[in-house]
């Protein structure tokens, strides 16, 4: 097994432990799912003992380092509290320490960061494209990423948010909220896969299946074939998305 497998086990150990510390916030169904995740993670830990011996406590400690990004040698600007509107209600977002993550070679990342249409505010703007509600600002190859993971108090189900911001401006420029799922362990694994994919486009309650289809479309779109940023084309493209509407 690979080092990635060990890290994944450590992350799951940390998440399961932290969630069970908040049992009073969980309904019976969610608590049972987290207990099941903890049991399966302990089984994985025993399986890995032949090549990566460690205690449960060691796994939790390493998982916390991975989750919080403290193992990364990087300074992260402080994220300020914000809220996301979902179904007419504003839900708070609490930001964990940010991780610097490699962007990869997906052509969608080759466009520069641009200000919002008022020319001053660097904020995410909602667009409707290919059946998905998405938030996107252009990238100048400087994104950092934060993952926030906690039981949603309103639904007692796990929800995820990926928060993106530009190091040049130290302003939030996008976020992703993945749809709540009944299977917590499955949902967390999807969450990790989304991070590893290097694909960042924010959606509002859109399944990861649709997210992947948007990714495929973006890779095939000749517009994103530009190897150098073109601010005029970028602004025109963003404006066309806004005018297209839902």
Swiss-Prot record:
Transmembrane segments: none annotated. It is found in: Host cytoplasm; Host nucleus. GO terms for biological process: symbiont-mediated suppression of host cytoplasmic pattern recognition receptor signaling pathway via inhibition of RIG-I activity; symbiont-mediated suppression of host type I interferon-mediated signaling pathway. Its main location: host cell. GO terms for molecular function: RNA binding. GO terms for cellular component: host cell cytoplasm; host cell nucleus. Signal peptide: none annotated. InterPro entries: Flu_C_NS1, Flu_C_NS2, NS1. Keywords: Host cytoplasm, Host nucleus, Host-virus interaction, Inhibition of host innate immune response by virus, Inhibition of host interferon signaling pathway by virus, Inhibition of host RIG-I by virus, Inhibition of host RLR pathway by virus, Interferon antiviral system evasion, RNA-binding, Viral immunoevasion. Prevents the establishment of the cellular antiviral state initiated by host RIGI, which normally triggers the antiviral transduction signal that leads to the activation of type I IFN genes by transcription factors IRF3 and IRF7. Also participates in the up-regulation of the splicing of viral mRNAs. Belongs to the influenza C viruses NS1 family. This is Non-structural protein 1.
